[in-house]
Design a protein with these regions (language model features):
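Short loop/turn segments that connect beta-strands within beta-propeller blades
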Residues: 4-8, 56-60, 118-121, 164-167, ...
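A short beta-strand motif characteristic of beta-propeller blades
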Residues: 9-14, 61-67, 124-132, 189-195, ...
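Conserved loop/turn at the beginning of each blade in beta-propeller domains
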Residues: 16, 71, 135, 186-187, ...
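Residue-level detector of Asp-centered blade-edge/turn motifs that repeat once per structural unit
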Residues: 27-28, 82-84, 144-146, 206-209
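Short, conserved, GDST-rich strand-edge loop motifs in beta-rich repeat architectures
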Residues: 35-49, 89-110, 165-174
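The canonical Cys-X-X-Cys-His
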Residues: 258-272
């Protein structure tokens, strides 16, 4: 929806696919990239994945739906690199083609961010943010600057800080990008996982020097220094009392209760816990 700020009226609308969540403009202002939260297709096919819709800002028409890696769902975060070359999309990567008989090494669910080539409006590949023996469940927001990429993990209550330049160099040199879907070692030596205070970090805001990360289930604001990676935390509601319903929702989203933190209930039932 395009809204005239002066009048507050809707000027133009355009349909995407399903449950749009995030949006970002290309650096030249020509395109608007929009995440579709869930796949808009039958779920019993061999390839099931959500798409990023591309809107031509001038005509306000959808020009393309870019489908991500097989199993991509719960598309939440979206950002564009400072040079405008790539768009990063944070999402869950489900392994729906195998029986749900185990959890280790991301057998059922992994967390990832997909990379979209802005110039070609095409899917370039995906980066897994889990480790071989430890998941990074509940991936939510993603942001970047020239130096680093920042990702919140709502299920493991932490933020990942990734060496941006080194990641891009390794990604572009990777010989067969189709194998990235299962590469749990790609970020080895490139990423720092920083535990946060509180429970359930989701959205974040960045400025030149800091990353501000509130926690959804604890009313705690975490402030991360980009240079030193030092963390300070401020309780916003220290006398907060949790209801039974809130406790249940917190458990539903908490991967700390899962073997090696691979997933929470939200991993298979994203959004409002649909089944």
């Amino acid at each position: 929806v395009e809204i005239d700020l002066a009048s507050g009226k809707i000027v133009r609308t355009v349909n995407v696919l399903r449950e749009p969540r995030s949006a970002v403009f290309s650096k030249d202002g020509k395109y608007l990239f929009v995440t579709n939260f869930l796949p808009a297709q039958r779920a019993d096919l061999d390839y099931v994945a959500a798409c990023v819709s591309v809107i031509d800002v001038n005509t306000f028409e959808k020009v393309k739906d870019i489908q991500l890696a097989n199993g991509s769902n719960a598309l939440r975060g979206l950002c564009i690199t400072p040079d405008g070359k790539y768009v990063y999309v944070s999402h869950n990567l489900g392994r729906f083609t195998v029986p749900t008989s185990q959890l280790q090494q991301g057998w059922m669910n992994t967390s990832a961010f997909s990379i979209i080539d802005v110039e070609n409006l095409s899917y370039a590949g995906v980066v897994i943010v889990d480790e071989p023996d430890r998941g990074a469940a509940g991936i939510w927001s993603i942001a970047c600057d020239e130096k680093q990429i920042y990702i919140t993990h709502s299920g493991t209550h932490e933020v990942s800080v990734i060496d941006h330049e080194a990641m891009c160099e390794k990604f572009e040199a990777y010989p067969d990008k189709s194998r990235l879907d299962y590469d749990l070692t790609f970020l080895y030596g490139l990423r720092t996982r920083i535990p946060l205070q509180g429970n359930g970090p989701r959205c974040m805001v960045t400025n030149e020097n800091k990353v501000f990360i509130p926690t959804y289930f604890a009313d705690v604001l975490n402030v991360l220094d980009k240079e030193s990676l030092d963390l300070t935390s401020v309780p916003l509601n220290p006398d907060r009392t949790e209801t039974v319903e809130q406790k249940g929702e917190r458990y539903f989203n908490d991967a700390a209760h899962c073997f090696q933190n691979w997933q929470s209930c939200n991993g298979c039932h994203p959004g409002d816990g649909r089944t």
